[in-house]
Amino acid sequence: MLFNINEKGEPLVISFAPFLSPEAIKHLQENERCSDQSQKRTAQQIEAIYTSGQNILVSASAGSGKTFVMVERILDKILRGVSIDRLFISTFTVKAATELRERIENKLYSQIAQTTDFQMKVYLTEQLQSLGQADIGTMDAFAQKVVSRYGYSIGISSQFRIMQDKAEQDVLKQEVFSKLFSEFMNQKEAPVFRALVKNFSGNCKDTSAFRELVYTCYSFSQSTENPKIWLQENFLSAAKTYQRLEDIPDHDIELLLLAMQDTANQLRDVTDMEDYGQLTKAGSRSAKYTKHLTIIEKLSDWVRDFKCLYGKAGLDRLIRDVTGLIPSGNDVTVSKVKYPVFKTLHQKLKQFRHLETILMYQKDCFPLLEQLQDFVLAFSEAYLAVKIQESAFEFSDITHFAIKILEENTDIRQSYQQHYHEVMVDEYQDNNHMQERLLTLLSNGHNRFMVGDIKQSIYRFRQADPQIFNQKFRDYQKKPEQGKVILLKENFRSQSEVLNVSNAVFSHLMDESVGDVLYDEQHQLIAGSHAQTVPYLDRRAQLLLYNSDKDDGNAPSDSEGISFSEVTIVAKEIIKLHNDKGVPFEDITLLVSSRTRNDIISHTFNQYSIPIVTDGGQQNYLKSVEVMVMLDTLRTINNPRNDYALVALLRSPMFAFDEDDLARIALQKDNELDKDCLYDKIQRAVIGRGAHPELIHDTLLGKLNIFLKTLKSWRRYAKLGSLYDLIWKIFNDRFYFDFVASQAKAEQAQANLYALALRANQFEKSGYKGLYRFIKMIDKVLETQNDLADVEVAAPKQAVNLMTIHKSKGLQFPYVFILNCDKRFSMTDIHKSFILNRQHGIGIKYLADIKGLLGETTLNSVKVSMETLPYQLNKQELRLATLSEQMRLLYVAMTRAEKKVYFIGKASKSKSQDITDPKKLGKLLPLALREQLLTFQDWLLAIADIFSTEDLYFDVRFIEDSDLTQESVGRLQTPQLLNPDDLKDNRQSETIARALDMLEAVSQLNANYEAAIHLPTVRTPSQLKAAYEPLLEPIGVDIIEKSSRSLSDFTLPHFSKKVKVEASHIGSALHQLMQVLPLSKPINQQTLLDALREIDSNEEVKTALDLKKIESFFCDTSLGQFFQTYQKHLYREAPFAILKVDPISQEEYVLRGIIDAYFLFDDHIVLVDYKTDKYKQPIELKKRYQQQLELYAEALTQTYKLPVTKRYLVLMGGGKPEIVEV
């Protein structure tokens, strides 16, 4: 029971323990350290759980128990008197929110079982019941709640929907873009706009490249806290700032000088090699050595004296001098080994080459950028207007609305800040600036709890910015008064073999330049238990490389996908694990960088009978055969003269016309017509008036008649029925749904067809009607090279898992294979014609006409694409950001493993040393080398080569073709089947007899205790009421639903576009209103309207509430005035829980419910319940709800040990409020 009231009706105050002081936390840490528990909490975990009263940033390494810490902290808050609904808990995914809620629920149940204090049990039970309504979820979900409740304050209806289908978004975007593009092409600044379009698309007819530019700018702006302000103030920031050589950032100059000095140092190391050949046979310096010494000396001098010799203004001159000094090639050869000494410097020189010329023309592109800024701003506003009109928004819109509500309404913002005791965020490293702004508005400035790991920030494509986490980390370390940093380093997931190789790799690879964090001692993984440190020699990490000196010929042509030989290596290792060590398939996971080009893995595994479950691939729903057949069927129904669709339908299994049939039909041309469609030829063939009627034999004629009859019925039905019903009619008429069940991948095919019907139904429910619009929408999706989400089907559990690294985040697996390690990182974005940056704005490649510079007179123009200075700055930052994220992806992949990690790739064994750098600089790989290497494999090989004297905890092994023969790979061992002829130990009949006896006993028990079996553990008064209804009918008591049935069964057609309001929703809204209504004020229409804004219901439901009737209850009835007179004794919407005994099974069960209102006096209780049911006579409702009110009265009497002297029903379903005493 949840009433915290004593026997006299006075509230009981639970004495909660205070929050722990720093000294108490230290004492607890010491006690934990000295305890004899098998699994102890670490000192840092204890600190993270119990520290309070300030902002806290928890940097939790992989496997360090961050979820455990969050759950324990939440439970501790609850035990210290903080209600669960006063905690804001943000998770990255809906799944994570569900799991967190379940863990909290289990903890509360456990705590209730352990607690002996009755009042604490009541309090914890209240928390358990409030858990479902607590703010535990994604930022998107919370933003929707804010907008649903307060959207009216910024003019947004609470009746909105989320556009989750990218195809629908693209269709609306295309409509807005086309209209806006036409307007700009006819405006006053049209010549500048045309130049802008030509700069990206080449001509004004093909606008696809320009459209992509606009869409990308729009999407990028949506991840900022205020898109409009960002577009107005930051979009052209770099274009305005970087216009001269002096404007180049110092950091970029430092990187160039560092590359020059590194090149000099590397060249010196090469010249010092024993086999280099410094001297000729005569003993004098060799020409090569003299030349290299000159390069070393000049590069060192220019770096040392850069400011006095050149400075920023002379940067262009420095680039020319260095270019003329060093050789054009990258390598220096010593004893037939090539060392790429000059490669990095050449890349840097390329970045700065032609700066003077670029800056000369860069100013010409500024008017184009201003036009682009105007267009994107106009597009953003127009697109939003369309979405407001449709009342359909993207998630980013809803979050921006929520930010606007909190920024513009001080009272709403303060109410949230006062309400939340703490603002908790999981996966903080993946927040974007929009989400960060929302969190800042919800916090009071000193109550944030953020958990994350910057080393696992891998969602840059969602505009996540790890620098948000990084900045907080730096700020809190420099200024502890702003917040506290707690490091969770202990890993409780992986064996030492995995931890050691992870530390070895990333201590040589990751720092703030690449990776965004220095992987030093405070970030290294430490085993959390002694069991993890027990060594297993066979679990040492392996880098297995297929030797590509002799290519197997099975690799994809673009060499980006995984090859057959690499997959065979994996299959061989899995067979060995399964056969020799008994590792179940489900303990093995394959991780890949992307979902595409993985079919070869499934195909190869099938050859070796290894079961595999894939995470899916490219979205090809609309391109699946069965869906294409149905879409062409719908196209034909919409327009039979569409020859392509018609032929596809005729050739489909539904009608099975072959090539010969189609050829005969095609010859039925009307010679008088120039153009004749296939549908007309079919009609002429049926009536025998084609050019060659003799070709139409009886069998073909019969097929044509069936086809035309079926098509006619479908076309007629399409005009009257829904799309959903039409699709199912097609399935049933031609048995197509059943047909695909007999084909390969039958389950997937049927799921796809079923989903097509559901999507058509969803399409019509969203306000779009008709077959034509549906077909048009699908075609637009295909035109934009998009697709609809694939349909998932059930997968086997005992199988190897194949998933992307992104999908694996947060999961763990005993054995992990990281595949395709030789795949180059995608650098597509840094080669686009534009690059966006949050601080700098946009940088573009400008198509300049350099005819005047060249003095050309014969050509009309000489166009050259130039990388403007803002573009180069953004490009460098984007390159480093991409490499940093790839490094973090590798960290995530490696730390998923519990026992062993494998790296799989391919490389040329004879060339494997070419990538290495001969200079060892400290503990890290040289920055220039890390920037130069573009695969996981290259990083690992470079570390293995340069730090070969260390134990790196992984071995490199090349696999030859001879290792991958059928005999070498082997086969899975299958268990020995029982020999049916061997009856020596066959006791089958005895076993069956015993099983039958057991089944009979179980059946008898089930029969004896049937009532108890079907008895729910928890029941509600409404359920009991429903159970009594069948018993009331035979004795002449009418059930209200039956007595109030309309006399006519005819249903009038519903033409109104208004949303139908359910009676149950009105009832819920009335109860909410009666709960929040302030009784200390006079009850009038204004009071009721003010209270109405506070309830969580949509506008249609609020409008349906009869406020005059509610006002009449309080003003015109004695009970309503009783409410106002004795409001201090009034309890509203009070939950209760009592133990009952089922009369049939004699088993106990819990009865839970919520009492609308009751008045608690010293010697008695008055019970009130509101009803909105429609009725003819009040006696009907009195009989219907008598049992329910008796249960309420019993609960109150058990709780307070006082009689319930009066029970009232307040009936709001009639013409006026009526009071019935029960």
From Swiss-Prot:
This is ATP-dependent helicase/nuclease subunit A. It comes from Streptococcus pyogenes serotype M28 (strain MGAS6180). Residues 524-810 form the UvrD-like helicase C-terminal domain. Residues 39-495 form the UvrD-like helicase ATP-binding domain. ATP binds at A60, S61, A62, G63, S64, G65, K66, T67. The heterodimer acts as both an ATP-dependent DNA helicase and an ATP-dependent, dual-direction single-stranded exonuclease. Recognizes the chi site generating a DNA molecule suitable for the initiation of homologous recombination. The AddA nuclease domain is required for chi fragment generation; this subunit has the helicase and 3' -> 5' nuclease activities. One of its GO terms (cellular component) is cytosol. Heterodimer of AddA and AddB/RexB. Keywords: ATP-binding, DNA damage, DNA repair, DNA-binding, Exonuclease, Helicase, Hydrolase, Isomerase, Nuclease, Nucleotide-binding. The keyword Transferase does not apply. Belongs to the helicase family. AddA subfamily. Its cofactor is Mg(2+). It catalyses: Couples ATP hydrolysis with the unwinding of duplex DNA by translocating in the 3'-5' direction; ATP + H2O = ADP + phosphate + H(+).
